[in-house]
Amino acid sequence: MLTKEQIARRIAKEVKDGYYVNLGIGIPTLVANFVRNDIEVEFQSENGVLGMGPFPFEGEEDPDLINAGKQTITALKGASFFDSATSFAMIRGQHVDLTILGAMEVAQNGDIANWKIPGKMVKGMGGAMDLVASADNIIVAMMHTNKAGDSKLLKECSLPLTGVNCVKKVVTNLAVLSVENNSFKLLERAPGVSIEEIQAATEGDLLVTGEIPEMQF
């Protein structure tokens, strides 16, 4: 079973040379710490940063440099800063190659719910709806089950939707799965996790074909 950092490390393998990548709040913000040094990647934050680096070391934080989740960040050489209108013009104009988001639920058809739990106070959906409506490549980073032990990979989302039929891949603490043919296709297992354990934790239809390798980092 993976930690949040290991989930982020696995997702970092999906980041390709030359990509412009938007990182959502939560586990996705960790991805910048694990990208290979031999590729060039531009991380974008919807609050107006292009060229985010990894988190700063303790004692080196700059309170004026934050991401959309209000966490302190570093800026790489050549980074730029701009207003939200420009930031969302980049997003809505489909200039982002990869979007990595957290989620409360993902459905087997690619629907995502990640902004509201009815009855709980929320600040709003933020930029997630713009991201899922504009991006062609969306990866979700999340735990496989919620705190009550219920699956977050469902036949249909029960929470208010952020986007419809948009998620391409999900990386959890148990597995890597793609969304294909109205089902979750199992691609990789977390080290030491069996297919049966993944099946038991997945409410949606799980497609398993051939040998399923363990994740490599």
Which residue ranges define each predicted feature?
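N-terminal active-site beta-alpha-beta segment that forms phosphate/nucleotide-binding
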Residues: 1-76
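Conserved phosphate- and dinucleotide-binding cores of soluble alpha/beta proteins
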Residues: 3-6, 57-217
